Regions:
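C-terminal regulatory/oligomerization modules of transcriptional regulators
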Residues: 112, 120-125, 184, 255-263
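N-terminal helix-turn-helix
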Residues: 1-75, 79-80, 87, 239-244, ...
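Short, basic/aromatic recognition patches
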Residues: 81-89, 154-199, 244
Length: 263
């Protein structure tokens, strides 16, 4: 990994639940020596990607991040496009729905809405990177990504988050084949205990998966009927979203989705 990559990777540690991080915490989280870490943080600060709380000296995201996020949305307005579909599903089924795009090490949520008022809810941090191997979003994306990318992800040491997290590359590859055949991914407590999720990919102009739509829900509220409802809601939304984005749904996926909607 290049010096620039190592420095930029530090930005991934920030989240809504972790808006500020001090030098010592960075060292604990990254295992990078303090000297190198300080140089990386100084470079990011000088470039505007980070700023320091003058009282605590902890680092937080800087104005350059906001500017680039605005440029991205103005030039590639995918957030505005997916927002309609996420809101629609969330309002219909009264559960947490989110859209995510792939990054190097996982899926990054770009928009989420919890349409329910249940006492038991899924705690979701939009700034958190969702691991490819442990989430329905990640698996739905991997199933329709190129073999080289998938190979790199599965060749790494796969972290176990719960007793149900899949960490065997062969088993995951087999699951990806199943996902390719049906067009959606389902996970049961593989990333967080008592939480299940369903996800479908959405596709770009070349028929490649460029992101996912997903529903996360406490497993106590999942039954066969509602499971089917979630899948049909996601398939319908992704089909329309692909149309809006000018995307091409692969023929086998379109057939699988059409069959599912007929049931």
């Amino acid at each position: 990994m290049s010096t620039i990559e190592k420095a930029l990777t530090l930005l991934e540690h920030f989240s809504s639940n972790r808006p500020e991080i001090g030098l010592t915490e960075f060292k604990t989280r990254t295992s990078i020596d303090k000297g190198t870490l300080h140089r990386h943080l100084t470079a990011l600060k000088n470039s505007g990607f980070l700023e320091q709380n003058y009282l605590t000296k902890a680092y937080r995201l800087g104005p350059a991040v906001i500017r680039l996020a605005a440029v991205r949305e103005n030039t590639v307005p995918i957030v505005k496009t997916v927002q309609y579909y996420v809101d629609r599903i969330a309002n219909d089924i009264h559960e947490l729905v989110h859209a995510a795009l792939p990054q190097k090490n996982g899926m990054s949520a770009i928009y989420a809405k919890d349409g329910g008022n249940h006492k038991v809810r899924v705690n979701f941090d939009e700034a958190e990177i969702l691991p490819f191997h442990a989430t329905s979003s990640g698996l739905a994306l991997l199933a329709f990504h190129d073999d080289t990318f998938v190979g790199k992800i599965l060749s790494k040491k796969l972290v176990s988050f719960t007793d149900s997290t899949p960490t065997n590359a062969i088993d995951i590859q087999a699951n990806l084949e199943t996902i390719r055949a049906c067009g959606f991914a389902f996970t049961d407590q593989s990333y967080e205990d008592e939480v299940g999720s369903v996800a479908v990919p959405f596709f770009g102009v070349k028929g490649d998966a460029i992101g996912t739509l997903a529903i996360a829900i406490p497993v106590s509220r999942i039954n066969e009927t509602f499971h089917e409802t979630m899948i049909t809601q996601l398939i319908t939304a992704s089909t329309e979203l692909c149309r809006d984005l000018g995307g091409q749904i692969p023929t086998n996926v379109a057939k699988a989705w059409a069959t599912k909607l007929e049931v």
